[in-house]
Amino acid sequence: MNAAKSLSIVPFLDCLSRLKTTPRTGWLYHGIEKPESIADHMYRMGILTMLCNDPSINKERCLKIAVVHDMAESIVGDITPHENVSKEEKHRMESEAMVSITQQLIPLNLSLQAEEIKELFLEYESASTPEAKFVKDIDKFEMIAQMFEYERKFNGEKDLSQFTWAGKLIQHPLVKGWLNDVLQEREQFWASVRQKKL
């Protein structure tokens, strides 16, 4: 990177831009054409964190974690279990990517902000705080909500029930309540699909 480039925000913006155009790989593996992007996923997660009504959780911090947690995927891509990459290797790759991304901010006198972004990522990865745990629940819930949207979009021609496993890991009562809403509506939807086939 030359000196002129190192003093520009553009390389950092380019990283963020890739999040807008990189599809969530899991949907591609299940035949969803033109699926949501990584940024689509993080945006809805961010909005959902703002609905947190638990006074013991800092929802502003949750929002920050939500919009940072998959940032490394702008470099490493959306790694799914299909790739057979170990959790340790995935964490190593993503941690290195976060260093690379945030280093672009240092020449712009944004060292503190770069450090905050890395800390938010590591907090999420380690699930070391109530906020990180809440965002992990939101991450799983958002995927299940998206699953149901795709099932409805394809009028019941695609059964994506293999994604529902994530719901069993959701802990926070608020997110569990939302999950129950989605799963109940999904049950009604599939009952209607089966009825039409009779």
From Swiss-Prot:
One Gene Ontology term from the biological process aspect of the record: deoxyribonucleoside monophosphate catabolic process
Highest taxon of source: Eukaryota
Residues the record lists as binding a divalent metal cation 1: 41, 69-70, 139
This enzyme's EC code(s): 3.1.3.89
Keyword tags: Cobalt, Cytoplasm, Hydrolase, Magnesium, Manganese, Metal-binding, Nucleus
Record note on cofactor: Binds 2 divalent metal cations. Shows activity with Mn(2+), Co(2+) and Mg(2+) but shows no activity with Zn(2+).
Top-level class of the enzyme under EC nomenclature: hydrolase
Cofactor(s) listed in the protein's UniProt record: Mn(2+); Co(2+); Mg(2+)
UniProt keyword Nucleus, yes or no: yes
Molecular function per GO: 5'-deoxynucleotidase activity; GMP 5'-nucleotidase activity; metal ion binding
Places the protein is found: Cytoplasm; Nucleus
Binding site for a divalent metal cation 2: 73, 78-79
Chemical reaction(s) catalysed: a 2'-deoxyribonucleoside 5'-phosphate + H2O = a 2'-deoxyribonucleoside + phosphate
Main location: cytoplasm
GO (cellular component) term, any one: cytosol
Domain HD: 38-144
Keyword Nucleus applies: yes
Role this protein plays: Catalyzes the dephosphorylation of the nucleoside 5'-monophosphates deoxyadenosine monophosphate (dAMP), deoxycytidine monophosphate (dCMP), deoxyguanosine monophosphate (dGMP) and deoxythymidine monophosphate (dTMP).
Assembly notes: Homodimer.
Protein name: 5'-deoxynucleotidase hdd1
Species this chain originates from: Schizosaccharomyces pombe (strain 972 / ATCC 24843)
